[in-house]
C-alpha cells in the first residue's frame, strides 16, 4: 500500500482458483501459474501448477498477481509499461534473491541484454523468454528502489494517475530519462562479468556467475 502510494485499497479482490480441467486453465499456457484481470479486480490462479520462477511459493504467486491489481488502482487505470508493472509485482511478492542476480548476470555474459522498450513480447513467447523478461524487469525496479528509495515508486505512479505519461513521470521523479536510467543500470551491472574468463565448462561458468552475484 505505502510502496504504491495507495491510501485506500479499493474493493475486495476476487481470487479465482481454476482447476486444470477448467476451460480457463486449458486456454492458458501450461507454464503460467496465474494472471490478473486488473481492471476487474480479479486474479486467476492455477493451484495444481507448481509455481516456478519468478514465484517459488503459492503465497508469492498470490501477492504477485494481487500486486498487478493494486498497481492498476494506484495509477487510476492509466497504463504503465509491462516491464514496470511486472517488476513491481515481483518486488511486492517477494525479496530479491540470488537466483535473480544470477539470471541478470547470465544475460550480461551471454549477450542477451534487451532494451526495456523491447521487453514486452518476451513475457509471452516461452517459459525461458518470460523468465528472462521477469529477471530484467525485476532487476530494474529493484535498482530504482535502491537508488531513489521506495517513495519513488509511489511518486511515479501518482504522477501517472494525475495525467503524466510514464516517461515524463519517471523523469520528473528521478531526474533521468528512461534511456539514461537504462544505460546507467547496465553500466552498474557490467562489472559482474568483467572477470569471467572464457571457459569450456558451462557448469563452471554458472558457479562463477553465482559467486559474483553474491557480491552484487
Q: What does each model-identified segment do?
A:
Residues 1-80, 133:
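Juxtacatalytic substrate-recognition/specificity segment
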Residues 21-27, 96-101, 163-168:
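Secretory-pathway/luminal and periplasmic proteins that interact with or process carbohydrate-rich
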Residues 45-57, 73-79, 89-90, 124-130, ...:
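Second-shell loop/turn segments in exported
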Residues 52-61, 79, 83, 128-135, ...:
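Soluble non-cytosolic domains of exported or imported proteins
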Residues 60-73, 86-90, 141, 149:
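Active-site recognition of the HExxH zinc-binding catalytic motif
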Amino acid at each position: 500500500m505505502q510502496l504504491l502510494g495507495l491510501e485506500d485499497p479499493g474493493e475486495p479482490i476476487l481470487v479465482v482458483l481454476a482447476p486444470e480441467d477448467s476451460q480457463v486453465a486449458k486456454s492458458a499456457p501450461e507454464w503460467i501459474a496465474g494472471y490478473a484481470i486488473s481492471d476487474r479486480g480479479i486474479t486467476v490462479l492455477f493451484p495444481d501448477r507448481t509455481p516456478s520462477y519468478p514465484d517459488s511459493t503459492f503465497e508469492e504467486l498470490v501477492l504477485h498477481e494481487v500486486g498487478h491489481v493494486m498497481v492498476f488502482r494506484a495509477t487510476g487505470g492509466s497504463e504503465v509499461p509491462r516491464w514496470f508493472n511486472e517488476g513491481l509485482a515481483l518486488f511486492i511478492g517477494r525479496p530479491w534473491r540470488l537466483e535473480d542476480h544470477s539470471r541478470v548476470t547470465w544475460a550480461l555474459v551471454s549477450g542477451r541484454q534487451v532494451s526495456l522498450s523491447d521487453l514486452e513480447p518476451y513475457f509471452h513467447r516461452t517459459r525461458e523468454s518470460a523468465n528472462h523478461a521477469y529477471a530484467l524487469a525485476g532487476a530494474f525496479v529493484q535498482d530504482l528502489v535502491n537508488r531513489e528509495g521506495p517513495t519513488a515508486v509511489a511518486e511515479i505512479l501518482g504522477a501517472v494517475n494525475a495525467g503524466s505519461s510514464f516517461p515524463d513521470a519517471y523523469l520528473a521523479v528521478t531526474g533521468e530519462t528512461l534511456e539514461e536510467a537504462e544505460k546507467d543500470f547496465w553500466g552498474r551491472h557490467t562489472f559482474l562479468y568483467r572477470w569471467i574468463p572464457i571457459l569450456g565448462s558451462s557448469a563452471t561458468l554458472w558457479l562463477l556467475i553465482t559467486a559474483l552475484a553474491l557480491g552484487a
